[in-house]
């Protein structure tokens, strides 16, 4: 019945998803002419469309045995393995495609995608660049290259390539979304928000974009918009555990502990074996000063996912504050084994050494921490502290000044500078920093007292208004604004009016 029908008609049936009819057409052709490679290709595609992947693999293999130089078939063959999660076989197939056509951009891109999934970022970068070299309009390869740079924290490079992808394919909402992620990661929060809003203007129901927009608003401490978008994302897809974790994180930042735990409980009803849920539960306990409870949660996370460095690091932090130094060091060393280039790990290893009065080890670890994360004021303070202990006064001055440049309100840094200048004989400067230290210390006592009361009474708007006023009186408007936003979210008209006045003053 079908031998007279053409290969073209078979492919038209595939386009209309009439896979069983297409299988009959191509089978009839192949039975008459088993060397018809186009019919074999169509038959494999039809079997794949019908959901019979093993049969599709068998047909592709038969076709390649007849002519191994079919680079398009090697790519299609590789795609089947990639979709099954067999990255090694997929990569082998894509390499065969490139062997027969070194300019095959899909083969180059797909091989790079597999390598990216395998975290072989350097080789993946090479193949993405080759794909772009042979097709300067290949926006998919540009987006993938940008994603590699995002994963490597090379945000400026990521933005460059994602902008190029946007120019190559201005209609791609996916490219615009990735560009927004890159801007947020590069701390261009407002630019990231703009990209996300452009995507949602076209497709307002996308849960992932709403979630990431909510996170971006949270980074700007716009709590109402953050909660609105994250909650909308959950409404669209309530099974996404990261959305529940983000919601919990926002609530905890607002001292809404019950709501924070409730969000995580919803996540646990979906899957109790996700380590990140227990880490977030631990964070809530830690932020409230309950280190034993925090440690239990972090240890659970480490049991569930022992390969996750963050679980061990968090356990180490809790153990450090519980003064269980040997156990803390063991946890940090395990984290270091899993994530060797992380400033926070070396920072706490240095603090463990400081607590043991092992100044040499402390200095070495803190120097490594500062090298990996030179924008962390606490690292520079602790480095200055150990240099003070070993009477390296000039080095201590330099370290403490770097800490001060990052955070001029750090009371410990101010006190340290006062002591250093006293030792260096610069008494005027010493008195200046010590006087400033007393001011900040008193301010911190007052804010800490209010924060404790807010955690106990999270719906008390008056307490938040008093806290915001404390920051305003110190001209620390950037810290007053998020607290006023919290109060406004809870329904304070006074906070809304204050916010409006402050934002009008600081708006460029």
Where are these regions (language model features)?
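Long, contiguous interaction/recruitment modules in multidomain scaffold/adaptor proteins
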Residues: 1, 143, 178, 212, ...
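Terminal, low-structured helical/coil segments at or just beyond the last alpha-helical repeat
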Residues: 431, 439, 448-508
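Alpha-helical segment of the N-proximal tetratricopeptide repeat
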Residues: 5-28, 32, 42-49, 79, ...
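Structural signature of tandem alpha-helical TPR/SEL1-like repeats
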Residues: 15-24, 49-62, 83-96, 117-130, ...
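Structural marker of alpha-solenoid helical repeat scaffolds
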Residues: 32, 66, 100, 134, ...
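Helix-start (N-cap) detector for alpha-helical repeat units in TPR-like alpha-solenoids
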Residues: 3, 37-38, 71-72, 105-106, ...
């Amino acid at each position: 019945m079908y031998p007279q029908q053409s290969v073209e008609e078979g492919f038209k049936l595939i386009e209309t998803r009439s896979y069983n009819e297409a299988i009959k057409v191509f089978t009839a052709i192949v039975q008459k002419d088993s060397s018809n490679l186009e019919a074999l290709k169509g038959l494999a595609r039809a079997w794949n469309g019908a959901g019979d992947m093993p049969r599709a693999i068998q047909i592709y293999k038969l076709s390649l045995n007849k002519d191994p130089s079919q680079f398009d078939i090697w790519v299609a063959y590789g795609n089947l393995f990639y979709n099954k999660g067999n990255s090694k076989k997929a990569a082998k197939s894509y390499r065969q495609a490139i062997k027969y056509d070194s300019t095959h951009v899909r083969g180059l891109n797909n091989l790079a995608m597999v390598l990216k999934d395998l975290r072989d970022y350097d080789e993946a970068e090479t193949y993405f660049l080759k794909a772009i070299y042979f097709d300067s309009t290949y926006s998919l390869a540009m987006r993938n290259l940008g994603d590699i740079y995002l994963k490597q924290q090379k945000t400026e490079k990521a933005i460059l390539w994602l902008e190029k992808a946007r120019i190559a394919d201005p209609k791609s909402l996916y490219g615009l979304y990735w560009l927004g992620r890159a801007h947020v990661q590069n701390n261009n929060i407002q630019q990231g928000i703009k990209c996300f809003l452009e995507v949602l203007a076209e497709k307002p129901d996308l849960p992932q974009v709403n979630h990431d927009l909510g996170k971006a608003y949270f980074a700007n401490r716009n709590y109402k918009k953050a909660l609105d978008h994250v909650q909308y994302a959950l409404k669209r897809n309530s099974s996404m555990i990261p959305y529940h974790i983000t919601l919990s994180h926002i609530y905890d930042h607002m001292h809404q502990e019950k709501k924070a735990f409730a969000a995580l409980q919803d996540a646990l009803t979906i899957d109790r074996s996700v380590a990140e849920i227990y880490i977030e539960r631990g964070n809530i306990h830690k932020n409230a000063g309950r280190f034993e409870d925090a440690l239990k949660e972090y240890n659970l996370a480490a049991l569930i996912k022992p390969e996750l460095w963050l679980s061990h690091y968090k356990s180490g932090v809790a153990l450090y504050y519980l003064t269980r130094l040997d156990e803390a060091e063991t946890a940090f060393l395990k984290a270091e084994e899993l994530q060797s280039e992380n400033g926070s790990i070396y920072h706490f290893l240095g603090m463990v050494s400081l607590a043991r009065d092992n100044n040499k080890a402390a200095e070495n670890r803190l120097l490594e921490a500062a090298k990996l994360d030179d924008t962390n004021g606490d690292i520079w303070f602790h480095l200055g502290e150990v240099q003070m202990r070993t009477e390296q006064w000039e080095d201590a001055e330099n370290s403490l000044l770097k800490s001060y440049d990052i955070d001029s309100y750090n009371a410990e840094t101010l006190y340290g500078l006062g002591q250093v200048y006293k030792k260096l004989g610069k008494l005027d400067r010493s008195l200046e920093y010590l006087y400033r230290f007393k001011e900040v210390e008193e301010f911190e006592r007052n804010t800490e007292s209010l924060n404790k009361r807010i955690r106990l009474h999270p719906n008390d708007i008056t307490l938040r208004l008093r806290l915001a006023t404390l920051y305003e009186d110190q001209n620390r408007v950037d810290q007053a604004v998020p607290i006023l936003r919290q109060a406004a979210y809870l329904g304070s008209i006074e906070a809304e009016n204050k916010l409006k006045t402050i934002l009008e003053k600081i708006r460029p």
